[in-house]
């Protein structure tokens, strides 16, 4: 069993983009930015507990940080992990939470 404290630290933010919006509409998939050391099992448990939905599958990828220049100095952005979470049929996560 994964501790609740760890589950709260796994999901950092939803990742909203054109691609993630199309995935949400066509394949019932939600995209999250997650902790770099998070496992698929932790991500699945965190989404199920925090949003009270049933998760079918989790796919992950690590996006490498870009090298950026500021004046004469070069720096590097941090690597980050993205998770594509496929929800069960009929399940939905509403990030906007607009008034009905």
UniProtKB/Swiss-Prot annotation:
Q: Which InterPro entries match?
A: Nucleotide-bd_a/b_plait_sf, Ribosomal_uL23-like, Ribosomal_uL23/eL15/eS24_sf, Ribosomal_uL23_CS
State any GO CC term.
Answer: cytosolic large ribosomal subunit
Q: State the Gene3D superfamilies in the record.
A: 3.30.70.330
Taking the record's annotation, the residue ranges forming a coiled coil are: none
Supply one GO molecular-function term.
rRNA binding
Q: Which GO terms describe its biological process?
A: translation
> Keywords on this record?
Ribonucleoprotein, Ribosomal protein, RNA-binding, rRNA-binding
UniProt cross-references to PANTHER family, sorted A to Z: 60S RIBOSOMAL PROTEIN L23A
What family is this protein classified in?
A: Belongs to the universal ribosomal protein uL23 family.
Q: What does this protein do?
A: One of the early assembly proteins it binds 23S rRNA. One of the proteins that surrounds the polypeptide exit tunnel on the outside of the ribosome. Forms the main docking site for trigger factor binding to the ribosome.
Quaternary structure, from the entry: Part of the 50S ribosomal subunit. Contacts protein L29, and trigger factor when it is bound to the ribosome.
Q: What is this protein called?
A: Large ribosomal subunit protein uL23
Taxonomic lineage from the root? Bacteria, Pseudomonadati, Pseudomonadota, Gammaproteobacteria, Alteromonadales
Gene expressing this chain: rplW
């Amino acid at each position: 069993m994964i501790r609740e404290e760890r589950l709260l630290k796994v999901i950092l933010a939803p990742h909203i983009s054109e691609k993630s919006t199309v995935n949400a509409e066509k394949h019932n998939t939600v995209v999250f930015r997650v902790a770099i050391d998070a496992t698929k099992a932790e991500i699945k448990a965190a989404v199920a507990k925090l949003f009270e939905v049933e998760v079918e599958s989790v796919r992950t990828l690590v996006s490498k940080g870009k090298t950026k220049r500021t004046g004469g100095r070069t720096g590097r952005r941090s690597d980050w992990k993205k998770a594509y979470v496929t929800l069960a049929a009929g399940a939905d996560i509403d990030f906007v939470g607009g008034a009905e």
